[in-house]
Amino acid sequence: MNKPTIAITSLTCCEGCQVAILDLGERFLRLTGKIKIGDFAFLEEHPESEEFDIVFVEGAPITKKNKERLLNLRRRSKILVALGACACLGGIAEIKDYQDKEERVRYVYKNIDSIENPDIKPLRDYVKVDLEIPGCPINKEEFLDVVKKLIMVISQGLTMEQMPKIARRPVCYDCQLKQNICLLQKGLPCLGPIMLAGCDAPCPTSGYPCDGCRGPLKNVNPDNLNKQLIKQGYSQQEIDMILQRFGVLEEIYPQLPVKA
C-alpha cells in the first residue's frame, strides 16, 4: 500500500497549531512512518510533492496571495482539512471586522496610501473544506486521531460520508468529566455551555473561563447564556467583546452586520 502524501501548511497565523503537532514528540515521528510528508515547513524548507492526498491548512486567508494559495492547495489535494481557530472561524484576526477597519489602519500605519484590508473569513467561505479541527491551538490528540482515521479512509477507499467526525457536545461535558467547579455558577463569563468540546477543557480546569476558541455548537441558541451573563452584571458590550475574540459572534449571529 502506498503511503498517503500529506501537507501541513499555513496562511496568515501564528503557526501555533503546527507547534502543537510537534508537541506529539515521538508519536509524530512514528506517524511519519505511515505517511509521506509532502510539505511541512517546520521540517523541510521546500516541499517534496506537488499533489497531496491530505492537506492541513492553518491560518486565515487575509491577503489576495493567501486566497490564491488556498485555491491552489484545494486543486492539488484530495482532502482539505482546516486546522485551528483561524482556519475554522477567522480567529483572532477577525476582531478587526467588528471595528472601524480604516481607523485601525490609520492607527497602525501613519503614512500609507493603501493596504489590503478585507473582512476576515474562514476557509470554508473560499473553498470546499472536508473537515475542520478547531481550537487555539488545536488539541494534538485530536489531530493524531484524525490523521489515523484519514489514513484508513484513503487506504480503504471509503467515501467522504465515512470521514471522521468531530464530536458535537459542549465544553461543559469535558468539565463534568474532570469534575470541575462550574465557573459560570461562580459568576465568571464562561462560554462553555454553547461552545464545542473536544479540547479537554484546559481553560476552565485552570480557572479561566472558556472564550470559545473551538467555535459554537451547531444550531445553538446563545440567548439564554446571554441573559444569564447580563443578570450576573456583564454589559452587552463586554459579552460581545468575548464573542468577538475568535470570530464566534459572527458564527452565532450571522445576521449582524460587520463594520466597514
Residue ranges of predicted features:
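Portal/gating segments that form or line small-molecule/metal binding sites
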Residues: 96
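Short gly/pro/ser/thr-enriched loop/turn and capping motifs at secondary-structure boundaries
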Residues: 86-91
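Iron-sulfur (Fe-S) cluster-binding modules
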Residues: 1-56, 61, 65-79, 102-260
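Short beta-strand elements at the ligand-binding edges of bilobed clamshell
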Residues: 99
